[in-house]
Amino acid sequence: MHDITDLPAWERLFKKIVWKQLGDMEGKKILDFGSGEGITANHFAEKNDVTAIEPSKEMLSNAWKDYEYTQIVGDVNALSAFKNETFDMIICHNVLEYIDDKAAVVKALARVLKKDGIISIVKHNRAGRVMQMAVLLDDFEKANEILDGKDSTASKFGTIRYYEDNDITKWEPQITVSDILGIRTFWDLQQNQQKHGDEAWQEKMLQLELRVSQMQE
């Protein structure tokens, strides 16, 4: 049985924040598109009917599957197997940045989402990346490039192609943005690695992150 404490501290905090924001779900049909190692799919599969789609066989070799869920190896084309309005909830976390045709993916996801369903999209924050480059990495050249609208990179996944929140509704007008929440606002600013490993500190940080995640400014 996998446990969230098996994850690096930063990822553990990320998952806890996102799961808390999504809320407790039971008896729902959920799609995790770009499911990676299946950590979130596995979490919600305890009480829900979950389908996970992931193109990387390498990531799936380490998949968490303590609870039963359907795993599909594939990409957006795999969605053609599902009828319109199949899912109550669609999870698409840190995925669209790495896709060339974002509009096609968003439209395909919207098709299989129920009329009263919810799609949870987690995206990279351009301003946060600029702060990371300027404050933490002392890379002013890269910070300015990102401010100028250029792409960035992630060591594990490649080029990060940033997009804005309102792009989502431009790609698919049937989707409306009901809420915008923050994730991991403060964590990376603490550079003391010993602090990161302190469970009491982690809990205090989690509560603070959750508190500010709903603030609009």
Where are the regions that the model predicts?
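A short glycine-rich, Lys/Arg-flanked "PGG" loop and its adjoining helix->strand segment in the class I
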Residues: 103-118
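A C-terminal cap/extension of S-adenosyl-L-methionine-dependent methyltransferases
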Residues: 170, 179-217
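Conserved class I S-adenosyl-L-methionine
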Residues: 1-26, 39-43, 59-62, 118-146
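A short acidic, Gly/Pro-enriched loop at the edge of an enzyme's catalytic core
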Residues: 81-89
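Class I SAM-dependent methyltransferase SAM/SAH-binding core
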Residues: 37-78
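Short alpha-helix
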Residues: 157-175, 180
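A short SAM/SAH-binding and catalytic strip from SAM-dependent methyltransferases
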Residues: 89-101
